[in-house]
Amino acid sequence: MKNTQLLNSVKHHIEAIYETVEGIDYRDLSIDLIDIMRLQQVDSGQPVRYVNHWDESDCLVISYGDSILQEGETPLHSLKHFLDKQVKGSINGVHILPFYPFTSDDGFSVLDYSSVNESLGDWRDIESIATDYKLMSDLVINHCSARSPWFENFVNGRDPGRNFFVTASPNDVLSAVVRPRTNPLLREVETADGTQHVWCTFSHDQVDLNFRNPDVLKQFASIIRQYLDSG
């Protein structure tokens, strides 16, 4: 590890995050995260503090991936064409709402974080937008689709996914949990490990991810790395 300052900084945060979780090697996990993010050769261990990368001159468009449609084009290509022809010079950034394959909630019940919904386009469309505009997107990290490969693996007792989701007992005292939903908080699921009750803050199609498992954190670090590589 070339940059011990970076390692120590990451380890400090990992210790705070996983203070109450037993059996975690803070140093090994920190090294894994640095490797996943490909930061091994970074010269400076600390980012410059309190640098605001946004100011009053920034103006952004927020859009679903299919808000702009043109016959014969993918929606994301049409979005780029609209930005270039209609608002370039007036705006310098675009926030695209979830553009992944999904099963419900307008894109917020994600099936596959590593893919672009093929009905919208592909990663080349995302990279094209990022070439000319500051690009922002949603990373839905609190839950994923109950039909995702991770949850299928949870049901079948396979990795990755077997221990990726928050579970609880129906005997737990949950009356203090307040949420604007009508469906029960817990969903009963038959799995290879027996009957389990998974935590569903939003809906039974959106199962909460368990970040007490460091493998979940590493999966999302890998996803973030992919997004950065794509603009």
Regions found by a protein language model. Give the residues of each.
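Active-site groove signature of glycoside hydrolases
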Residues: 227-231
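Acidic/aromatic-lined carbohydrate-recognition and catalytic surfaces
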Residues: 3-221, 225
